[in-house]
């Protein structure tokens, strides 16, 4: 792993902040936009960690954040941050029974989140969902167009909710992580179920991480043309900066201008109290911040 020397303003040497930036100090040079920023995609959890995140978000002009917060933490976050935070429905990823946690229990949670004011329901369908399915005894258990997901989408539709989904992953992951095509398929294979879901359910959809394909603006252009209920978010900042930065500036500007109103801003900011603790991490998100 590349290790860079800490910047002079670094708070501490931290592998999750390889440039050693003091983000509060960096915010002082951020331009005033004249309007508030809405972050449509974040994961704000942890009583301590969220208290660190909130002033930094405000310093950069973020006035509202839509967060995939654990159901059990929603009351605390709402009490603490009020109208500055809204919630996106997620399953219990720590549930020991994948089939139940992403199936029947998720139906219950969708309704409970909705009662708490959530307007968006998330369907996580990165290729790793196949591993979850195999663990539960059914490779296609969490397929986006499978019976379990369709039942959940029907519920979301009845409740008047928007759907968000994570489909595919970076090209680099398919070159290094998902090399078993018999198991994971090709990257493009993951878009057929998405297209079927978009055609079947007409509510607005948000495909996270620029639809999982910032590497190919032409593909995204055709996807948006074909599905008028589809929107994309810009979350997963490092991925977006790396891949969108490869395109000529005029192509990016042209794409964003053409699809103004259907591209929404998101960061994929993750906060969890695990980040503040030494030692092994229980969750994947906790581990990512220290790797």
Please provide the spans of the model-predicted regions.
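Hydrophobic faces of well-ordered beta-strands that scaffold small-molecule active sites
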Residues: 37-42, 64-67, 85-90, 121-123, ...
């Amino acid at each position: 792993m590349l290790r860079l020397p800490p910047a002079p303003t670094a708070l501490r040497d931290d592998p999750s902040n390889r440039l050693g930036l003091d983000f509060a100090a960096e915010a002082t040079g951020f331009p005033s936009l004249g309007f508030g920023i809405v972050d449509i995609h974040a994961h704000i959890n942890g009583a301590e960690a969220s208290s660190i995140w909130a002033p930094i978000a405000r310093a950069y002009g973020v006035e509202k954040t839509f967060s995939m917060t654990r159901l059990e933490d929603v009351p605390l976050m709402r009490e603490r941050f009020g109208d500055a935070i809204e919630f996106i429905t997620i399953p219990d990823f720590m549930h020991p029974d994948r089939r139940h946690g992403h199936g029947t229990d998720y139906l219950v949670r969708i309704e409970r989140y909705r009662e708490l004011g959530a307007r968006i329901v998330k369907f996580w369908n990165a290729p790793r969902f196949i591993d979850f399915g195999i663990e539960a005894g059914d490779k296609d258990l969490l397929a986006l167009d499978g019976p379990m997901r369709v039942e959940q989408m029907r519920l979301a539709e009845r409740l008047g909710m928007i759907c968000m989904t994570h489909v595919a992953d970076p090209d680099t992951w398919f070159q290094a992580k998902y090399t078993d095509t018999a198991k994971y398929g090709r990257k493009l294979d993951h878009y057929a179920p998405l297209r079927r879901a978009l055609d079947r359910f007409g509510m607005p959809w948000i495909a996270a991480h620029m639809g999982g394909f910032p590497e190919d603006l032409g593909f995204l252009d055709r996807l948006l043309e074909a599905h008028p209920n589809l929107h994309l978010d810009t979350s997963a900042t490092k991925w977006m900066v790396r891949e969108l930065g490869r395109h000529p500036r005029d192509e990016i500007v042209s794409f964003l201008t053409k699809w103004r109103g259907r591209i929404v801003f998101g960061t994929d900011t993750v906060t969890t109290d695990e980040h503040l603790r030494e030692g092994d991490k229980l969750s994947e998100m906790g581990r990512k911040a220290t790797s």
